[in-house]
């Protein structure tokens, strides 16, 4: 599901709320989550999961086109850990 599909589905389910308001709310929520992570803070949504940053240590990689070795710097990457309720709901497809 893409962001625009999410907005469309929410707007359909919440027909009493204008679609533009739903779009603005979704975009604002995602922007707030991104800025919270960028500040190094953790986000926890009970029953859904938590977002945090994990550190990736510096390493030697390879350029896929040339095969040359490339030194990659350490960096923080977003990480999502699903909550138990979400894992249980997703498990019906397993």
UniProtKB/Swiss-Prot annotation:
Key word Amino-acid biosynthesis present in the record?
A: no
**A Gene Ontology BP annotation from the UniProt entry:** DNA replication
Q: Name one GO cellular component term.
A: chromosome
Q: Which SMART domains match?
A: BHL (SM00411)
The record, for Pfam families, names:
Bac_DNA_binding (PF00216)
Query: Which keywords, in A-to-Z order, does the entry hold?
Result: Conjugation, Cytoplasm, DNA recombination, DNA replication, DNA-binding, Transcription, Transcription regulation, Translation regulation
Disulfide pairs here are none
> What is the deletion mutant like?
Increased in vivo levels of ATP-DnaA.
**GO molecular function terms here?**
DNA binding; structural constituent of chromatin
Record's InterPro entries?
Answer: Hist_DNA-bd, Histone-like_DNA-bd_CS, IHF-like_DNA-bd_dom_sf, IHF_beta
Subcellular localization, per the record?
Cytoplasm
Q: What does this protein do?
A: One of the 2 subunits of integration host factor (IHF), a specific DNA-binding protein that functions in genetic recombination as well as in transcriptional and translational control. IHF in combination with the datA locus promotes ATP hydrolysis of ATP-DnaA, called DDAH (datA-dependent DnaA-ATP hydrolysis). IHF binds oriC as replication initiates, dissociates within minutes and slowly reassociates during the cell cyle; IHF binding to datA is low before initiation, rises after initiation and dissociates during the cell cycle, allowing IHF to coordinate replication initiation.
Recorded family membership? Belongs to the bacterial histone-like protein family.
- How does the record describe its quaternary structure? Heterodimer of an alpha and a beta chain. Part of the relaxosome, a complex composed of plasmid-encoded TraI, TraM, TraY and host-encoded IHF bound to the F plasmid origin of transfer (oriT).
- Name of the protein in its database record: Integration host factor subunit beta
């Amino acid at each position: 599901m893409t962001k625009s599909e999410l907005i469309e589905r929410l707007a359909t389910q919440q027909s009493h709320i204008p679609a533009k308001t739903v779009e603005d709310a979704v975009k604002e929520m995602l922007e707030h989550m991104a800025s919270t992570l960028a500040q190094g803070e953790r986000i926890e949504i009970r029953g859904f999961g938590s977002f945090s940053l994990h550190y990736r240590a510096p390493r030697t990689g390879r350029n896929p086109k040339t095969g040359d070795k490339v030194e990659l710097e350490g960096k923080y990457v977003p990480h999502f850990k699903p909550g138990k309720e979400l894992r249980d709901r997703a498990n019906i497809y397993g």
